[in-house]
Design a protein with these regions (language model features):
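Hydrophobic small-molecule pocket/channel-lining residues, especially in calycin-type beta-barrels
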Residues: 3, 66, 70-74, 114-118
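Short secondary-structure boundary/capping segments
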Residues: 7, 35, 55, 115-117
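A generic secondary-structure signal marking the coil-to-beta-strand transition
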Residues: 6, 14, 41, 75, ...
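Extreme N-terminal tail/first-helix region
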Residues: 1-15, 143-154
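Charged, gly/pro-rich active-site loop segments
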Residues: 77-154
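Hydrophobic alpha-helical segments typical of transmembrane helices
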Residues: 2-5, 53, 94
Length: 154
């Protein structure tokens, strides 16, 4: 994917899969996350201060995030980079923005109200994408579709 397309795709509404090294010699920890990204900026994720994810993010100092389109033609963007900042405590405006990104306004208000008590226990990690990996299978899907048509009509 060209640069602008990949940035727009990452900024789109997806549940991301965050990956972070596990220093215990195990496979990386992979977890679904809500995130926020604006083209040219940092990837922003929030988690509980005492979670395994937070501990591993602090230790590794970097993480990856992968987002995908689950509908044909399939596409994905994966970014990896260093943690550029840890906001502790969470900025309530940032938490609000992430909730409103994933939920309609009424659901977001209810979610934020019901989880207000955990605000003091959450932290924000910011990552500046350094490596990008992308794929857009639209061309493959078009070729496959054309080959299938030729086989049927052939």
């Amino acid at each position: 994917m060209p640069g602008e397309e990949r940035e727009r795709f990452l900024a789109g509404l997806h549940v991301g899969v965050l990956g972070v090294a596990d220093g215990d010699g195990r496979a990386p920890l992979l977890v679904p996350v809500w995130y926020r990204y604006e083209p040219g900026g940092d990837v922003i994720v929030q988690t509980g201060r005492e979670t395994v994810k937070a501990r591993l993010l602090r230790a590794a100092g970097r993480f990856s995030l992968c987002v995908q389109d689950e509908n044909p033609p399939y596409r994905y963007v994966s970014v990896e980079g260093p943690v550029t900042a840890v906001d502790d405590p969470v900025d309530p405006a940032e938490r609000d923005a992430i909730a409103h990104r994933y939920l309609d306004p009424e659901e977001a208000r209810a979610y934020l109200k019901s989880t207000a008590g955990q605000l003091a226990d959450d932290i924000t990690f910011r990552m500046r994408p350094q490596r990008w990996r992308t794929a857009n299978f639209a061309a493959f899907a078009a070729e496959f579709s054309e080959a299938d048509r030729i086989d049927r009509d052939g």
